[in-house]
């Protein structure tokens, strides 16, 4: 079982005298930086000029270019997209990452797959909130927190875990729970979850169900409501109480269909595909494919994204959501 940590296990004094540079001010960067600042820690923001620069300044941060932030900071937390981190590290961070500093991540991709190779005289740690940046911020302001993972890749100082736990406390994660894992385990399980279940698996399952009903002559609106709109209702029940709560909340007819038909949809063929996907992650084949895709301006990524944006389910979804009051204020 994974080790668990809470507020009582974390001491903010481990980083209270240090300067933390948050590189990036997107969803995670903004959420983490604001929480750290509100926890009384010294935070600077490393960015290139643009809207995020102006936003960070307006929210009370000292903002500078990435290279200067890396030089000035004791702890450097990289919170820009995975595919950008390697180049930014080499050109703007590495020179300022001097002996005794701490390099941080919220996802292990670039360390685990060798896109970033830090010097041997720095600590390399991870604090990975298990929720988007706006949720990290919102729960903090409510006096709660989002669970997080910590991992230690290099612990030259001997204080890597203390630093990670203190940072996790600074963003509010120890108010919930913090689990200790490894860079390898976090990276591989995170990618697998995204590809096979949460994003890739779910969207493909929904599209297949939608297409099956539409091709059989059912109204696209009915297909959308049955295979996409109601997904949230079921997922929320599973999230709150596992499969048991979900099954206790649906009809006996639905539960019988779930138990007898579900394994026919996700059967041996799907299981074998999941094993293959996991192997591609473990061997680095997926990481290589993704890095190469970015080097040639993402032709596959862009084509597949456009195709899904033009799918009938998206058109129908926009029309249906426009009729529902709960979606009026959502962007």
From Swiss-Prot:
E.C. numbers: 1.1.1.86
Biological or metabolic pathway of the protein: Amino-acid biosynthesis; L-isoleucine biosynthesis; L-isoleucine from 2-oxobutanoate: step 2/4; Amino-acid biosynthesis; L-valine biosynthesis; L-valine from pyruvate: step 2/4
Active site: residue positions: 107
UniProt binding sites for Mg(2+) 2: 190, 226, 230
Record field: catalytic activity: (2R)-2,3-dihydroxy-3-methylbutanoate + NADP(+) = (2S)-2-acetolactate + NADPH + H(+); (2R,3R)-2,3-dihydroxy-3-methylpentanoate + NADP(+) = (S)-2-ethyl-2-hydroxy-3-oxobutanoate + NADPH + H(+)
A GO cellular-component term linked to this record: cytosol
Gene3D superfamilies in the cross-refs: 6.10.240.10, NAD(P)-binding Rossmann-like Domain
Protein family according to the UniProt entry: Belongs to the ketol-acid reductoisomerase family.
Identification of the protein by name: Ketol-acid reductoisomerase (NADP(+))
């Amino acid at each position: 079982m994974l080790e668990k940590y809470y507020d009582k296990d974390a001491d903010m004094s481990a980083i209270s005298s240090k300067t933390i540079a948050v590189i990036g001010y997107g969803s995670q960067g903004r959420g983490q930086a604001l929480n750290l600042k509100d926890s009384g820690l010294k935070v600077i923001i490393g960015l290139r000029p643009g809207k995020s620069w102006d936003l960070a300044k307006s929210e009370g941060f000292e903002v500078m270019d990435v290279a200067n932030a890396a030089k000035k900071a004791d702890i450097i937390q990289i919170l820009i997209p995975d595919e950008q981190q390697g180049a930014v590290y080499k050109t703007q961070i590495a020179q300022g990452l001097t002996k005794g500093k701490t390099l941080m991540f919220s996802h292990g991709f670039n360390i685990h797959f060798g896109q970033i190779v830090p010097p041997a005289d720095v600590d390399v740690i991870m604090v990975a909130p298990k929720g988007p940046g706006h949720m990290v911020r919102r729960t903090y302001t409510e006096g709660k927190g989002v669970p997080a993972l910590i991992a230690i890749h290099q612990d030259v100082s001997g204080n890597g875990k203390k630093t990670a736990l203190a940072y996790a406390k600074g963003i509010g994660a120890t108010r919930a729970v913090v689990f200790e894992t490894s860079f390898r385990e976090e990276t591989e399980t995170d990618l697998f979850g995204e590809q096979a279940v949460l994003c890739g698996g779910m969207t493909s399952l929904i599209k297949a169900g939608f297409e099956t009903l539409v091709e059989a002559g059912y109204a696209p609106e009915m297909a959308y409501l049955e295979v996409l709109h109601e997904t949230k209702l079921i997922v929320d029940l599973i999230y709150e109480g596992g499969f048991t709560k979900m099954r206790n909340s649906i009809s006996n007819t639905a539960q019988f269909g779930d138990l007898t038909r579900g394994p026919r949809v996700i059967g041996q063929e799907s299981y074998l595909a999941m094993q293959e996907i996991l192997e591609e992650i473990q061997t680095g084949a997926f990481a290589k494919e993704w890095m190469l895709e970015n080097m040639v301006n993402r032709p596959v990524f862009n084509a597949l994204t456009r195709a899904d944006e033009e799918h009938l389910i998206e058109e129908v979804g926009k029309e249906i959501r426009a009729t529902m009051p709960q979606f009026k204020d959502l962007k």
